[in-house]
A protein has these predicted regions:
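Start-of-helix register in tetratricopeptide repeats
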Residues: 20, 54, 87-88
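Short coil turns that delineate tetratricopeptide repeat
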Residues: 50, 83-84, 117
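Alpha-helical segment of the N-proximal tetratricopeptide repeat
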Residues: 20-44, 48-49
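Short, conserved micro-motifs composed of acidic
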Residues: 91, 98, 102, 111-365
Length: 365
């Protein structure tokens, strides 16, 4: 899952006349987040000999958003001098890191830091310009093993409650395909853990799954409440873009109650919005604080880690940003809070090895 990046789309315009027709169609596909189909169109008129640097960058971004970092790097390099914006510049650096070209990534990051000196990623890099070497040479603390229920599709977002293991997967081939990567829509599954690597055959969590994306999830320690991500379309909350014949929705958070092993009364959380996404929930062991990722106003970067108080009467406080100790001008996501108040999260805004790296911080300090 290292290469399954969670990033907002970026669209380049002002294409050259030769690619005007194809690029116009590609723009429509990109606006619908259908990057795989956009690549098919763009590669018909863009190649390594092309003079259309803006089209090259558009193709590079499509490859980047679909985790094809080697292809993305090739086109970023060819059109490097034409990069005008910070996001695309950092995408290129991230590709180099993901492709293990750390010296090139550091050289590109130095140029980024000179151009965008106030960016938190620049200041952190200049303070820790040997961070990559330190990461590569650090002693391994964990042993990673594959378990027997992985598929050839995306499987992630694992959550273990007693012996029941919940996770998110796009393995149901009958589901409609998501245009971003042409994989089936995500569903929530559960499996019974038999030992460290052997789990029972996964079963879809039908009472929460819909025809849209579901997951990841988090469950309270007593097993009574579940928090899960889904799409705003499930509650008919979206904007219509009539001239494009599009419907624009968001990822939102929902909660449900366990009634004799069945999840019932699913309802949206009150801080959901049509204007921003809220996802990746993690509830603490006392069921008093919910952590999540969001691009809501008031943040520092793209996606930030936030928290909200869960009151005793079931209401919620006002979401609070966790601030610059955790969040950067990049993306922070997938928070997980453990019983000792250690927060684990993923970030691409710090010196790392490419894509989303895992970090932890003790929230007691």
């Amino acid at each position: 899952m290292k290469k399954h990046l969670i990033i907002f789309f970026f669209i380049l315009t002002h294409n050259l006349l030769l690619a005007q027709k194809s690029n116009c169609s590609a723009n429509d596909l990109i606006e619908r987040l259908e990057y795989t189909k956009a690549i098919e169109l763009l590669t018909q008129c863009i190649d390594v000999t092309s003079k259309n640097t803006e089209g090259m960058l558009q193709l590079a971004n499509c490859y980047y958003y679909t985790s094809k970092t080697e292809e993305a790097e090739k086109y970023y390099k060819l059109a490097y001098e034409a990069i005008k914006d910070k996001a695309t510049h950092f995408n290129y650096i991230d590709c180099l890191r993901s492709n293990k070209k750390y010296d090139e990534a550091n050289a590109a990051m130095k140029k980024f830091a000179l151009k965008y000196s106030s960016d938190s990623r620049s200041t952190t890099f200049l303070k820790k310009d040997n961070a990559t070497e330190a990461l590569l040479n650090q002693q391994k603390k964990y042993t990673v093993k594959k378990i027997n229920i992985n598929s050839d599709r995306s499987d992630f977002g694992g959550f273990l409650l007693d012996s029941t293991f919940y996770f998110v997967s796009s393995r149901i081939e009958q589901n409609k395909k998501y245009g971003w990567n042409e994989e089936p829509y995500l569903d929530i599954f559960f499996s019974i853990r038999k030992n460290d690597t052997v789990f029972s055959q996964p079963i879809p969590l039908k009472e929460l799954n819909s025809s849209f994306h579901e997951g990841p999830i988090s469950i309270t320690k007593n097993g009574k409440n579940i928090y899960f991500a889904s799409e705003s379309f499930t509650v008919n909350q979206f904007d219509k873009i009539k001239n494009k014949k599009l419907k624009s929705g968001q990822v939102q958070l929902f909660t449900a109650t366990n009634d004799h092993g069945v999840w019932i009364y699913a309802k949206p959380l009150p801080f959901n919005s049509k204007l921003y996404s809220v996802s990746n929930p993690s509830v603490n062991s006392t069921n008093t604080t919910l952590y999540f990722s969001s691009n809501m106003p008031g943040g520092i970067g793209g996606n930030d880690i936030w928290k909200v108080t869960i009151n005793g009467d079931g209401t919620y406080g006002k979401p609070e940003n966790l601030g610059p100790k955790i969040n950067t001008e990049g993306d922070e996501s997938f928070p997980f809070i453990d019983e000792n108040n250690l927060l684990y999260f993923a970030s691409n805004g710090r010196p790392g090895l490419g894509g989303l790296d895992v970090y932890k911080i003790d929230l007691k300090n």
